[in-house]
Amino acid sequence: MRAYHDLLTRILSEGVRKEDRTGTGTLSVFGHQMRFDLADGFPLVTTKQLHLRSIIHELLWFLKGDTNVAYLKENGVTIWDEWADANGDLGPVYGKQWRSWAKPEGGTVDQIAWILDEIARNPDSRRLIVSAWNPADLDRMALAPCHCLFQFYVADGRLSCQLYQRSADAFLGVPFNIASYALLTAMMAQVTGLKAGDFVHTFGDAHLYANHLEQTHLQLSREPRPLPRLRLNPEVRSLFDFRFEDIVIEGYEPHPAIKAPVAV
């Protein structure tokens, strides 16, 4: 995970001070890319402990097309609570856009199902793209999509994924995002009969909040440990059939967690 540490180091050394929507203030760089070969291990940050339950359940929640936090809360995940309304609703956020993007003439598009079908039909397609950035729905979303567009790529029997993230909370959010999309890539690879390839993470505004700088220095003082391994239940052949117990991370031995406030 040196690539992640390099991102943190770059923001600290090159970042410009910017104001932001939350009023917290940030150090920010514009344009950065990381690449992880998933054959080398599962890219889970080891210099602080991450809450695996939240990462896995959030991805399953996205794939269900759900936009209410009830499922998350039932499974001990609170990462979306600050943005939910009194009924637990978040508006047409990620799950809605991934699974039922509204068409202007009526009806919806299931982008994830389309990708699965297109990989089977035409693995060389350059249209294997999912977007969560729907300008018509932004005003009704509790939080505009930060990780807003991703593309799959098939070559030599390997499935790779590139994510474009317009806004990236480098200390709290990015470790979750890396793990989530690496997991999605591995799950997609299994159900399409491919091997997991690279996960490429491309950023627009990558930033550290002003109240995360001390924690970032602490994390950078720690030596990364060997990456864990992901084990998926080989019996699962449909992406939408994956359950929490089908996803196991083995050999994760991180440094202790580092607490930091969430900018809302």
From Swiss-Prot:
Domain of life of the organism encoding this protein: Bacteria
Pfam families reported in the protein's UniProt record: Thymidylat_synt
Catalytic residues as annotated in Swiss-Prot or TrEMBL: 146
Catalytic activity: dUMP + (6R)-5,10-methylene-5,6,7,8-tetrahydrofolate = 7,8-dihydrofolate + dTMP
GO biological process, alphabetically ordered: dTMP biosynthetic process; dTTP biosynthetic process; methylation
GO molecular function: thymidylate synthase activity
EC number: 2.1.1.45
Signal sequence interval, chain numbering: none
Pathway assignment: Pyrimidine metabolism; dTTP biosynthesis
Binding site for dUMP: 21, 126-127, 166-169, 177, 207-209
Entry-linked InterPro entries: Thymidate_synth/dCMP_Mease (IPR045097), Thymidate_synth/dCMP_Mease_dom (IPR023451), Thymidate_synth/dCMP_Mease_sf (IPR036926), Thymidylate_synthase (IPR000398), Thymidylate_synthase_AS (IPR020940)
Keyword line: Cytoplasm, Methyltransferase, Nucleotide biosynthesis, Transferase
GO annotation, cellular component aspect: cytosol
Positions annotated to bind (6R)-5,10-methylene-5,6,7,8-tetrahydrofolate: 51, 169, 263
Subcellular location, record wording: Cytoplasm
Family: Belongs to the thymidylate synthase family. Bacterial-type ThyA subfamily.
Function: Catalyzes the reductive methylation of 2'-deoxyuridine-5'-monophosphate (dUMP) to 2'-deoxythymidine-5'-monophosphate (dTMP) while utilizing 5,10-methylenetetrahydrofolate (mTHF) as the methyl donor and reductant in the reaction, yielding dihydrofolate (DHF) as a by-product. This enzymatic reaction provides an intracellular de novo source of dTMP, an essential precursor for DNA biosynthesis.
Subunit structure: Homodimer.
Protein name: Thymidylate synthase
Native source species: Methylorubrum extorquens (strain CM4 / NCIMB 13688) (Methylobacterium extorquens)
Taxon lineage: Bacteria, Pseudomonadati, Pseudomonadota, Alphaproteobacteria, Hyphomicrobiales
